[in-house]
Amino acid sequence: MWTANILTLFPDLYPGPLGSSILGESRKNGKWDLNITDLKLFSEKNKRVDDSPFGGGPGMVIKPDVIDRALLSLKSNDFPIYYLSPRGVKLDAQISNSISKLDGMTLVCGKYEGIDERVIKHYNMIEISIGDYILSGGDLAALSLIHI
């Protein structure tokens, strides 16, 4: 069964759009599965998921240990890992076609200035952008990618 794993700070965003229309019906009929992982559950005692970028820089990034623990918790973690990022490869028909042939995918949704670069490299994440515009985070891009 095709599976989408989503790592996000906003898990409540997904059930509505993915529970209605043709996607909702196909999920009810067992055609695909959705695993939403709340990154906040993988924070330490202080409940902080963000920190200054390693090596300096503006803003805050999601901490690498939070992403690491969340990825390791997935039941099916052998899927390609896509990090939704404005600096990623721009989504086009060829990429969409290759994604549609996968058995599943893991989507990491950034927030703030993104996620720590070290975790992107460690997990060989594929950075992908859905276009040249600014969104409030990776969640709306993840919803778009799931619709492929």
Residue ranges and their predicted role:
Residues 1-74:
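N-terminal nucleotide/polyanion-binding subdomain common to many enzyme families
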Residues 5-7, 35-37, 82, 105-107, ...:
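Hydrophobic/aromatic beta-strand patches that form the interior of the parallel beta-sheet core
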Residues 40-45, 89, 134-137:
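A short acidic, often aromatic-flanked loop/helix-cap motif at beta-alpha or helix-coil junctions
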Residues 61-111:
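S-adenosyl-L-methionine/SAH cofactor-binding core of RNA-modifying enzymes
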Residues 113-120:
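Short, glycine/polar-rich helix-capping loops at beta-to-alpha or helix-loop-helix junctions
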Residues 146-148:
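Conserved small/polar residues in nucleotide/adenosyl-binding loops
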